[in-house]
Design a protein with these regions (language model features):
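Active-site acidic/histidine proton-transfer and metal-coordination neighborhood
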Residues: 1-62
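Gly/Pro-rich active-site loop or hairpin
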Residues: 5-11, 73-136
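Hydrophobic faces of well-ordered beta-strands that scaffold small-molecule active sites
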Residues: 30-33, 63-65, 94-98, 138-142
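Active-site beta-loop-alpha junctions enriched in small/polar residues
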Residues: 35-37, 68-72, 99-103, 145-147
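Distinct, well-ordered alpha-helical segments
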Residues: 40-57, 73-86, 153-154
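Long hydrophobic alpha-helical segments typical of transmembrane helices together
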Residues: 127-151
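C-terminal helical cap(s) of enzyme catalytic domains, especially alpha/beta-barrels
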Residues: 147-165
Length: 165
């Protein structure tokens, strides 16, 4: 979900847009992914996980939970990432993205994570384990776009397999 004001009015607009797409692409499903944000829009009235839940319920869509993005937002805006995960509807999380990257300066003191070119940090692994306590995603994607180190990736895939099974 792009950085938007988290209100019921925004939900209505997004739901309408998703339903238009689904009418054209019949028989398809729709996935929404959380982004990391440098700012929180004034006027937001709903927590992002509740916002996503509402969209999913109204459109039968599912969530791609990008754990590094969620972790960036938790650090930036002071919420508990485990409560965020637990607050997502049980059957809503279809896919997980994990990656390692750099923490970059965002707006004011806030940080964003960018890049898929480093090892996954331990806090992301811990949160992935927490996801599996509450959800059964169909897919987990380990993202790596450069600094390809085969041994490192194999180790991460082994760790991923252990967590997922």
């Amino acid at each position: 979900i792009l950085n938007t004001i988290l209100t019921n009015e925004s939900i209505d607009v997004i739901v309408g847009n998703i339903n238009k797409v689904l009418k054209v692409i019949k028989g398809s499903s729709f996935l929404i992914e959380n982004n990391s944000h440098c700012i929180k829009w004034p006027g937001s009235k709903i927590a992002e996980n509740k916002f996503s839940n509402s969209i999913c319920r109204k459109t039968e869509s599912k969530i791609i939970l990008d754990i590094p993005n969620m972790l960036a937002d938790a650090r930036n805006f002071g919420f508990d990432p485990k409560k965020y995960i637990k607050g997502l509807d049980v059957d809503s999380v279809s896919m997980i993205h994990i990656a390692g990257g750099d923490w970059l300066d965002g707006y004011k003191e806030n940080k964003i994570t960018r890049g898929h070119f480093k090892k996954v940090e331990e806090e992301v692994w811990d949160l992935l384990q927490d996801v599996f306590l509450h959800h059964v995603p169909r897919y987990v994607t380990l993202e790596r776009s450069r600094n390809i180190n085969i041994e490192e990736i194999i180790d991460e895939l082994k760790k991923l397999r252990t967590i997922c099974h």
